[in-house]
Amino acid sequence: MEEKNYHVDFKNKTIVLIYMLYFGDMVSISPFLEVLRREAKGSKILLVMDARFQESVKYNPNVDEIIPFDRHGKEKGMAATWKLGKKIGKLHPDILLTLHGTTRSTLLALAMGPKHWGGEEGTRLDSFFMDWPMTIETYNSHAVDKYLKVLERLGVKDLHHSGMRTFTSPEWEKKADAFYKSQGVSSEDRLVGLSVGSSTAEKNWPAEKYGQVADHFAEKGLIPVFFGVPSEIPLIEKALGAMKSKRYILAAGKLSMGEFMAAAGRCSLAFTNDSGPMYVFDSRGVPTIAMFGPSNAKFHHPLGPCSRAISSFDMPMGQEHVNKTIASGNYTPISEISMEEVIAAGEEALEKALKMK
């Protein structure tokens, strides 16, 4: 069934967005936020998001207020969800957009009572209350584009944007600089960032291969920097165990999310799996080589002019959920991606970036 298009006036409104996904997802909606801000002159834009990832958009100029929601902690229950919705309702929202519909987004929406409500349904109940219901996950476009299509269906004509972007602060930049200085890094040094983990083991290119890639670029004069969260340190240790070079920096567990974003921007090249750090490096203008296995590179690849996704197989577009793909076993393991292909992609990215300067 063909879905409807609408014409929405976004100017001089209080606009609430509900989007409670993960680190990388928050980076992927930055073009949406940029276009909405341009269209919504005189409006206040509020973003309801997972409290764990609020640093990812803390300094985004296209968001006026973040409403953090501790959905895995003290606000996990339905009563807390309803309470937050009632609190937001006191701001008298003119427009509510749910970019990822869930039972929780439905409850929030019903509690806040916006004048107009659009986006993705969280339950069948939503269709009785929504003014502009739509299917957002159509499995035929990149994550960035599927959210821009929401605005297009709401009548926005000018969809041009600056790509995925993350924004830091002078404080984060200062702390990132201090960290690098403590590791003996000078302003002339070139760094290669590596993020060896992801949300699930099946999405991880072998850590030992990351170590060998790090060795190759260390020989070229770049200093490998291993980023990550503390739980990824065992993986990083496997990578380090495969290295001959003893010159590397272990940044995992030593930087906040915002400080990582600042530190990532200092790199000349990055290697990652399909993960939040992939989008961060890319959003900071770093040539990013991203390895994909059971997740679909066509939906999630980095967008930078010098970035590239390498997939273990040509996954067709269509309905996809990485956990279901893993459970089915209908994919080529990410370990099948060769080290030689990854190194060649990195060399090409560096050369292309140099030509673009």
Tell what function each PLM region has:
Residues 1-357:
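Catalytic machinery of carbohydrate-active enzymes
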